[in-house]
Amino acid sequence: MKTTNLSKAVTAICVVLIGAGLINAQDWPQWRGPNRDGKVSGFTAPAKWPKELTQKWKTTVGSGDATPALVGDKLYVFTREGSEEVTRCLKAVDGKEVWQDKYAAQAVTGAAARHPGPRSSPAVAEGKVVTLGVGGVLSCLDAGSGKLVWRKDPFPKVVPQFFTAMSPIIVDGTAIAHLGGKGNGAIIAYELSTGNEKWRWADEGPEYASPVLMTVGDTKQIVTLTEKNIVGVGAADGKLLWQLPFAPEKRAYNAATPIVEGQTVIYTGAGRGARAVKVEKKGDGFVTKELWSNPELAPQFNTPVLKDGFLFGLTNRSNLYCINAETGQTAWTDATSQGRGGFAAIVDAGPVIMALPSSSELIVYKPDGKAYGEITRYKAAESPIYAHPVISGKRIFVKDENSVALLMLE
């Protein structure tokens, strides 16, 4: 039987996709991935891990620790150049710029001046890109053209001590962000298409944690750490549904993203440990029930991943660890320090866990609840990395101090 021209074309396309690492590749449209849980789908571990990563391209984009967002064949990067914050749309295949938007940004002062660029990851949905600048400016751009849709600054020059780090979330046509600073802030929801304010919960200002979405019964909730508590507010109206005290002390901060699994919320903070609660519907309201508490391990500047009943993360002393997520008991802690001060991104890549601490070494290890088992490690950049890696198929996009690069596992 003859091979048709169509089948030849399909075969050629498949070969190109496989070569580019795009088969089973997923989008990474927001902070910590599609579901804000650090999980990668479609990643296949190589039969033999290469000795090093292959750099396909690298381009200078400006300072900042914001994780890029990947949607289709476009990479959205948010950085600072001089006195301006810049959003760029790049072609994922070669790093070439498609469009950019920029505006004058607030000066970053004090200890935070060592990291003057944005830390908040863009959120991409419904044809829009939403960014949050270091000074609290929330912007919405058209994802295709870069045209400004709306820009808001509800708390001018009011920011947390080290400026903003929370990444906005888009839910049902609404952009939601925790804005302002200590003693003066609010979780605010804006209509994505118009920028009109839909609701605000103004009881507490933000620290550095990013919100996640949780559904209990038929109620969608925005769950986040605030200055002093962990809270759940209605995604549709901003009504406070439940809260638990979780105030940091001394040099501790609420910076880790809560982890949601069904009706369970796991949250962590330096000096207070890791905790798990169950959120339940009761009458017209909601109640919480503590499931466990682990005072030993409390990551602050990274968020663990939940995999097969275990939590994998990095301690404040930069030691990789594992907690039994059913009991809260420590399963293991590796003695080797990885980088600086507990800064890291932890990724569930299916057959492996990947950790990228600020040392810029990508550590690949087994998702084993019994013991730490390192598989390999790679140098991902020459300068420190504080952004999350974006993993899609065989592709790994990394943002270092001033550049973004595409690395390949091949």
PLM features per residue range, with description:
Residues 11-23:
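Hydrophobic helical h-region of N-terminal Sec-dependent signal peptides
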Residues 21-410:
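Noncatalytic, solvent-exposed loop/strand surfaces
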Residues 1-13:
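Bacterial N-terminal signal peptides that target proteins for export
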